[in-house]
Design a protein with these regions (language model features):
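N-terminal beta1-alpha1-beta2 submodule of the flavodoxin-like/Rossmannoid cofactor-binding fold
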Residues: 1-57, 131-143
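Generic structural signal for helix capping and beta-alpha/helix-loop junctions
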Residues: 4-6, 77, 118
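Generic recognition of short, well-ordered alpha-helical interface segments
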Residues: 35-42, 62, 92-96, 128
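Glycine-rich phosphate/pyrophosphate-binding loop and the adjoining helix
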Residues: 94-143
Length: 143
């Protein structure tokens, strides 16, 4: 997204038209301070507008579309637990996405996460995620 919008000026109409073309949507991003990167938050704020994504006049343009997240997380999966350092599961941290997409009547589906990338950023570690991610996408496409 930063490559498409280096000035961070999002072409809202273009993005809305792109979303309207597909029934399955994947938001892929690195977990950033236990949330989304700033430009993705801006994208959600600017693209999911009243009268298009929600509201009485909208027709809920994202409604019924299957939406998921694909996340790279810096820390190990085991650390996302109530009895560990970060106190919350990744699913709990992603609840705002679930609520956002439910609010606009999208079909929010289970997410994909690849953990431990902060300490294991070797090419080999990253390449291990490829078949897992490919399988996730293939299964998501069948839903």
């Amino acid at each position: 997204m930063y490559k498409v919008y280096p000035d961070e000026r999002i072409d809202v109409k273009k993005e809305q038209q792109l979303i309207e073309q597909y029934d399955h949507i994947v938001f892929q991003f690195p977990l950033y301070w236990f949330s989304m990167p700033p430009l993705l938050k801006k994208w959600l704020d600017e693209v999911l507008t009243y009268g298009w994504a929600y509201g009485s006049k909208s027709g809920y343009k994202v409604g019924g579309k299957k939406v998921t997240l694909a996340i790279s997380a810096g820390i190990d999966e085991r650390e996302y637990a109530h009895n560990e350092k970060y106190k919350y599961t990744l699913k709990e941290l992603l609840r705002p996405f679930e609520l956002t997409f439910e609010y606009i009547h999208a079909d929010f589906r289970p997410f994909f996460a690849y953990y431990g990338i902060e300490l294991n950023s070797t090419t080999e570690w990253i390449e291990r995620s490829v078949p897992l991610y490919r399988q996730f996408l293939e299964e998501f496409a069948k839903q």
